[in-house]
Amino acid sequence: WIMGHMVNAIYQIDEFVNLGANSIETDVSFDDSANPEYTYHGVPCDCRRWCKKWEYFNNFLKALRKATTPGDSKYHEKLVLVVFDLKTNSLYDHQAYDAGKKLAKNLLQHYWNNGNNGGRAYIVLSIPNLSHYKLITGFKETLKNEGHPELMEKVGFDFSGNDNIDQVAKAYKKAGVTGRVWQSDGITNCIASFIRGLDRAKEAVANRDSSNGFINKVYYWTVDKRATTREALDAEVDGIMTNDPDVIADVLNESAYKAKFRIATYDDNPWETFKK
């Protein structure tokens, strides 16, 4: 999965997919009452990026629905996965359940069209704080209460705080999550990737590939350089988040990687661990 980073303005959906992304990451900021409000990152953000592009969250969802609904004039067949980077650090821990509830209601109405031929992309809810695990509970229970528990099959999870993998496992246990787990690892592109290294990403890959692991997919962020792309592919990650999808696509075309990797399509289940 080539994951376009910080796609917060509607026009950027086309821009990133046209550069080669089959997945996008979108920031979601919340108001004081835990309502998802804007697709907005804010300052600071990655180097060489404008941090302040934004839309109202529901307007973005409607545009995203069009981009992922077959037959729509804005449809992109290859856009198959969306990561919502949920900026819940602005909330109190006790608001996490409400944030999940309100997020589910917004997605149900504006993205899934109340279950009536809505957008088809798989969705990853990426949460920065392990203590906000109740966001998952709130999301799940709301879809059930609204009569659409089946839509949870399109939803996976990520804790994005670079926490100890054992602690991440405990948070999922509390949330009752037993699958559909993506694990992120990484650092802003402003800091040279070798300073962080790929040790934790490799630890996540080892968990993914073990018989008793809880992780299904691993992605590494934010990668804009060819050398780092190669290192991430050599570590056998499933996804690379990038500001420059064309760079990742170029490296995937190199002879060393062409035979081993391909770009995921809608038929590739993002919740299944890939067996070599």
From Swiss-Prot:
Record: residues binding Mg(2+): 25, 27, 85
Tissue expression profile of the protein: Expressed by the venom gland.
Pfam families: GDPD_2
EC number(s) reported in the record: 4.6.1.-
Disulfide bond positions: 45-51, 47-190
One GO BP annotation of this record: killing of cells of another organism
Source organism: Loxosceles sabina
Enzyme class name: lyase
Requisite cofactors: Mg(2+)
Alphabetical keyword list: Cytolysis, Dermonecrotic toxin, Disulfide bond, Glycoprotein, Hemolysis, Lipid degradation, Lipid metabolism, Lyase, Magnesium, Metal-binding, Secreted, Toxin
Localization per record: Secreted
Protein name: Dermonecrotic toxin LsaSicTox-alphaIB2iii
One cellular component (GO) term of this entry: extracellular region
InterPro entries, per the entry: PLC-like_Pdiesterase_TIM-brl
Bound cofactor: record note: Binds 1 Mg(2+) ion per subunit.
Glycosylation site positions: 129, 253
Catalysed reactions, as listed in the record: an N-(acyl)-sphingosylphosphocholine = an N-(acyl)-sphingosyl-1,3-cyclic phosphate + choline; an N-(acyl)-sphingosylphosphoethanolamine = an N-(acyl)-sphingosyl-1,3-cyclic phosphate + ethanolamine; a 1-acyl-sn-glycero-3-phosphocholine = a 1-acyl-sn-glycero-2,3-cyclic phosphate + choline; a 1-acyl-sn-glycero-3-phosphoethanolamine = a 1-acyl-sn-glycero-2,3-cyclic phosphate + ethanolamine
Alphabetized GO MF terms: lyase activity; metal ion binding; phosphoric diester hydrolase activity; toxin activity
Task of the protein: Dermonecrotic toxins cleave the phosphodiester linkage between the phosphate and headgroup of certain phospholipids (sphingolipid and lysolipid substrates), forming an alcohol (often choline) and a cyclic phosphate. This toxin acts on sphingomyelin (SM). It may also act on ceramide phosphoethanolamine (CPE), lysophosphatidylcholine (LPC) and lysophosphatidylethanolamine (LPE), but not on lysophosphatidylserine (LPS), and lysophosphatidylglycerol (LPG). It acts by transphosphatidylation, releasing exclusively cyclic phosphate products as second products.
